[in-house]
A protein has these predicted regions:
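P-loop NTPase switch/communication element
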Residues: 1
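Glycine-rich phosphate-binding loop used to anchor ATP phosphates in small-molecule kinases
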Residues: 6-54
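Hydrophobic anchor at the start of a short beta-strand
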Residues: 28, 58, 107
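Conserved beta-strand segments of the P-loop GTPase G domain that flank and frequently precede/overlap
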Residues: 31-32, 61-64, 109-111
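Conserved nucleotide-binding/hydrolysis micro-motifs of P-loop NTPases
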Residues: 34-35, 64-69, 114-115
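Arginine/glycine-rich "motif VI" loop of SF2 helicases in the C-terminal RecA-like domain
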Residues: 50-56, 79-84
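Conserved phosphate-donor/acceptor-positioning beta-strand/loop module used by diverse small-molecule
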Residues: 52-74
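Small-molecule kinase domains that catalyze NTP-dependent phosphoryl transfer to phosphate-bearing small molecules
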Residues: 76-123, 129-133
Length: 133
């Protein structure tokens, strides 16, 4: 239902809010997977070019996580939105592409497979984003 009826509208709204926020601040973070868009040829480059027109720079943060860690976190989260995914894990996971996308300028890799990797990636992310200014 979500994929067919809500997703595209939700993502359009997220992008509109982000563009509006850029009018008031120089840094805007969007926390959405964009898993389809990140692999659509030209989508990220077109977005990058659109943002450059308003003086903004696109940085894509790709969160890496082991598949089993994802499953365990869904179990621990105990959310209704994960019920189908967990009950149909093999079918669900076949649809997810965990490989790092190719050809994206300003791609920051964030490893979230363990507490240690998360802390290290967080420190690196803070340094990375501070250096963009």
């Amino acid at each position: 239902f979500f994929e067919e009826n809500i997703r595209n509208y939700e993502y359009d709204a997220i992008m509109e809010v982000a563009r509006e926020a850029l009018e008031y601040n120089d840094t805007v973070f969007i926390n959405s997977p964009f898993t389809r868009e990140v692999r659509t040829p030209g989508y990220m480059e077109n977005l990058r070019q659109d943002l450059l027109k308003i003086g903004a720079e696109l940085v894509v943060v790709w969160v890496q996580c082991d598949v089993e860690v994802c499953r365990q976190r869904m179990i621990a989260r105990n959310s209704d939105r994960d019920t189908w995914k967990l009950e149909n894990w093999d079918e669900y996971i076949k649809k997810i592409n965990f490989t790092v996308p190719d050809g994206i300028k300003n791609l920051f890799l964030f490893n979230n497979s363990s507490d240690e990797a998360f802390k290290k990636s967080l420190d690196e992310a803070v340094k990375y984003f501070k250096n963009l200014k």
